Amino acid sequence: MTKSAELYQKAQQTIPGGVNSPVRAFNGVGGSPIFVERADGAFIFDADGKAYIDYVGSWGPMILGHNHAVIREAVIEAAQRGLSFGAPTEMEIKMAELVSELVPSMEQLRMVSSGTEATMSAIRLARGFTGRDKILKFEGCYHGHADSLLVKAGSGALTLGQPSSPGVPADFAKHTLTATFNDLDSVRELFAANKGEIACIIVEPVAGNMNCIPPVEGFHEGLREICDQEGALLIFDEVMTGFRVALGGAQAHYNIKPDLTTLGKVIGGGMPVGAFGGRKEVMQYIAPTGPVYQAGTLSGNPVAMAAGYACLTLLREEGNEKRLASKTKHLADGFKSLAAQHGIPLVVNQVGGMFGFFFTEQEQITCYEDVTKCDLERFKRFFHLMIDHGVYLAPSAFEASFTSLAHGSKEIEATLEAADRCFAILAAESK
């Protein structure tokens, strides 16, 4: 038994399921999860000392690579001055100014401690600002584990939402409507059936929680138009795409201006940080300037602010955005080419520094239903083959994978060599 397996058994005695976030348990792929001892650059090292080229990157934040010296030193320096004050600091101002400069639609913003907190707060603000209760999300998009967002579609496009987790009251979930990603008609139908009742649309501009699904042409433009016509706010959940799809986020990549934006992951440089912000008119509606209440003891934590500021300052250096996108495209194109050489049907999507692949005969993947039709068992087999070859991908067919600026040509080529061998095994097994 490996040390990771031993630790997993031990963890289950005191931690539900042995993990502090469900996807880490490998339920989506089977087997025992890797317990990480340390990480550096493009690599993680498990409790048994084995190295893996990492394409999870702590689920997105490690865009500069693990254990970056500049971020590490920023954290040490900040920690020496104190770990938490519960009072304003100058670094909060510097961080807010930098984020607003990089993402201009965020005229004002507030720091929080997680992406879930950011989306939860943005939705409360949208409801308070519009005076409406209902919100519209998309099937397969994940916006954190707040009650109003753990909702799935009903049996038809116009039915009330149903809780996707016990503990979420059905009476509460009924205020959340669920449309089909990349389908504007489904959005229009819900607005028509709930005239004047929908406060906002919240969307992952590139869906990263049903693997990696970009918007079809005109989708985001259509959402912007519908919100303008109906008096609803458009919220871009850029917790995953922020600074990764482009330096200014997916909204810069697709040239769309949302009313509110939520951020997380990259913004903290590896520390627990989130943020929400948008039009000044809307943000002024939040306490203490407005009636919508939101607060947090650790919001704007000085150590986390120092890490995030160092990360974004490095990330904005000239050439980094293009380098990240270029190496990710090279990797994605390589996966697609190698799969084709071995007769393995594979759809590969890539935007900026995120990518995903689907074992399927379908020509393209545009929504959650398409993902459910993919060969999930073949994904599980490929995942474990890649683990055996020293490559760590997202342990779920419904999660995107990520590159970092620390992934050099050596790591990319080693990954493609491993994929070549693994595709060959899959092809042989299917004969």
Swiss-Prot record:
It is an enzyme of class 5 (isomerase). GO terms for cellular component: cytoplasm. Keywords: Cytoplasm, Isomerase, Porphyrin biosynthesis, Pyridoxal phosphate. It comes from the Bacteria. Its main location: cytoplasm. Pathway: Porphyrin-containing compound metabolism; protoporphyrin-IX biosynthesis; 5-aminolevulinate from L-glutamyl-tRNA(Glu): step 2/2. Its EC number is 5.4.3.8. The keyword Cytoplasm applies. It catalyses: (S)-4-amino-5-oxopentanoate = 5-aminolevulinate. The modification N6-(pyridoxal phosphate)lysine is found at residue 265. Its cofactor is pyridoxal 5'-phosphate. It is found in: Cytoplasm. One of its GO terms (biological process) is protoporphyrinogen IX biosynthetic process. GO terms for molecular function: glutamate-1-semialdehyde 2,1-aminomutase activity; pyridoxal phosphate binding; transaminase activity. NCBIfam families: hemL (TIGR00713), PRK00062.1 (NF000818). Homodimer. Belongs to the class-III pyridoxal-phosphate-dependent aminotransferase family. HemL subfamily. This is Glutamate-1-semialdehyde 2,1-aminomutase. It comes from Vibrio vulnificus (strain YJ016). The gene is hemL.
